[in-house]
A protein has these predicted regions:
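Sequence contexts marking disulfide-bonded cysteines in secreted/extracellular proteins
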Residues: 93, 103-105, 181, 185, ...
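Secreted/processed peptides and extracellular or luminal domains of membrane proteins
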Residues: 110, 128, 177-180, 186, ...
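Short cysteine/histidine-rich zinc-coordinating motifs and their immediately flanking basic loops
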Residues: 183-189, 195-196, 214-218
Length: 230
């Protein structure tokens, strides 16, 4: 997890792990989770600050031959051995978007259960759901099989991008929506308290030129999901 108190350790950590033969490293921004905000003392990186910090890290990391791949949450997946990368905010490459896609394909493929047995759309939402009294099922009380067949939980994780567009005029009219696919629902809830709200991190990425900055940072490396905003 990266925050304002540890960015200077990233490159050294990455180089050490690469030298040890580690195949993959994942970096994630410590987000606005309720408990973290209570104890973080202002350490959370702002969205633009996070992007800039990660680009600085990537720029330094790829200066030398590497083997270890890097997954920077909501920023990029980087594969040094093939000199290729993908911008993670590009959920759908050109021509891939469909209204029928779930709002989060990760949620649709993985059941998240908290320590009390409550199911949530994803693990990052467990604190939010608990703090706001949101309940969509419990595996100890109702059993997993029934939760996966009908009810609030399955309705949540099967919600589609078409439903999001119908509930969110800003996203529906945005030229970047067909690429970001609405972004991350956990980030949206943290900032807007609306499961169909905007994900401001994706607005920042596309509207403030961070896609182009990533392409510039990676230079001649192959972009696995190139897009254009015609």
């Amino acid at each position: 997890n990266v925050h304002r108190k540890n960015p200077d350790t990233l490159l050294r950590t990455g180089e050490k792990m690469d030298g040890m033969g580690v195949e993959h490293m994942r970096i994630i921004r410590t987000t606005e989770a309720p408990r973290w905000l209570q104890n973080a003392d202002g350490a959370t990186l702002g969205i633009g600050e996070y992007y800039d910090t990660m680009f600085d890290f990537l720029r330094a990391y790829i200066q030398k031959p590497r083997k270890m791949s890097i997954d920077i949450w909501q920023v990029a997946q980087v594969y040094p051995q093939s000199k290729s990368y993908r911008a993670r905010p590009v959920e759908c490459a050109k021509g891939e978007y469909r209204d029928s896609f779930p709002v989060c394909r990760g949620n649709r493929g993985m059941v998240s259960v908290d320590a009390d047995g409550n199911v949530v759309p994803c693990h990052q939402l467990s604190g939010y759901y608990a703090n706001h009294g949101l309940y969509i099922g419990n595996v100890k009380k109702e059993g997993l099989q029934s939760l996966l067949q009908t009810g609030k939980y399955i309705d949540e994780v099967c919600a589609t991008l078409g439903q999001l567009k119908a509930s969110n005029e800003k996203c529906a009219s945005c030229k970047y929506f067909r690429y970001c696919a609405g972004g991350c629902r956990a980030i949206s809830l943290a900032f807007t308290h609306d499961k169909f709200g905007v994900d401001p991190s994706k607005c920042e990425f596309f509207k403030n030129g961070y896609y182009e900055k990533l392409v510039g940072t990676m230079g001649d490396w192959r972009n696995l999901a190139p897009i254009s905003f015609d």
